[in-house]
């Protein structure tokens, strides 16, 4: 079976936690689309195109991973890509309630869509894009939390 999965998120920026989930998903599914949400309700540090470019660089070693920015409903995006699986990461129990509601809403909007929840590797369980940006903002070292390309992009962006 040629199952196509979407791993959606804002990825502002992509962290080692995200990269780990993408790599694991790439081993589970024939084709993984990293769907980068434009999400107008959030004020991202990086533009949509910058986030696409960073994730392409981080995932370039994974031939079955495609990176696409999107606007609108995730359920519609997944349908337009022919995906039947949504991959979501759960860092802590506190993530579950929101993700459970989201999974049910997405299934209601697109009955062919199943949500799969992956937990992070222990060393990545506390990492979030928000925390990585906060550490970088205060000139802390983020090398253990994100890819070198992301480190360089953060440094450049925060010096502006």
UniProtKB/Swiss-Prot annotation:
It catalyses: (R)-4'-phosphopantetheine + ATP + H(+) = 3'-dephospho-CoA + diphosphate. Its EC number is 2.7.7.3. GO terms for cellular component: cytoplasm. Its cofactor is Mg(2+). Keywords: ATP-binding, Coenzyme A biosynthesis, Cytoplasm, Magnesium, Nucleotide-binding, Nucleotidyltransferase, Transferase. Reversibly transfers an adenylyl group from ATP to 4'-phosphopantetheine, yielding dephospho-CoA (dPCoA) and pyrophosphate. This is Phosphopantetheine adenylyltransferase. It comes from Pseudoalteromonas atlantica (strain T6c / ATCC BAA-1087). The gene is coaD.
């Amino acid at each position: 079976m040629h199952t196509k999965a979407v791993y959606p998120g804002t990825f502002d920026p992509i962290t080692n936690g995200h990269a780990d989930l993408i790599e694991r998903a790439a081993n589970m599914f024939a084709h993984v689309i990293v769907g980068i949400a434009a999400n107008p309700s959030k004020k991202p540090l990086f533009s949509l195109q910058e986030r696409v470019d960073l994730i392409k660089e981080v995932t370039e070693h994974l031939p079955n991973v495609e990176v696409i920015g999107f606007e609108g409903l995730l359920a519609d995006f997944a349908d337009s890509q022919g995906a039947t699986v949504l991959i979501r990461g759960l860092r802590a129990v506190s993530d579950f309630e929101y993700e459970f509601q989201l999974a049910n809403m997405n299934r209601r909007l697109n009955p062919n869509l199943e949500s799969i929840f992956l937990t992070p590797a222990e060393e990545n369980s506390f990492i979030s894009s928000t925390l990585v940006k906060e550490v970088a903002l205060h000139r802390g070292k983020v090398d253990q939390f994100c890819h070198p390309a992301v480190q360089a992009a953060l440094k450049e962006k925060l010096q502006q």
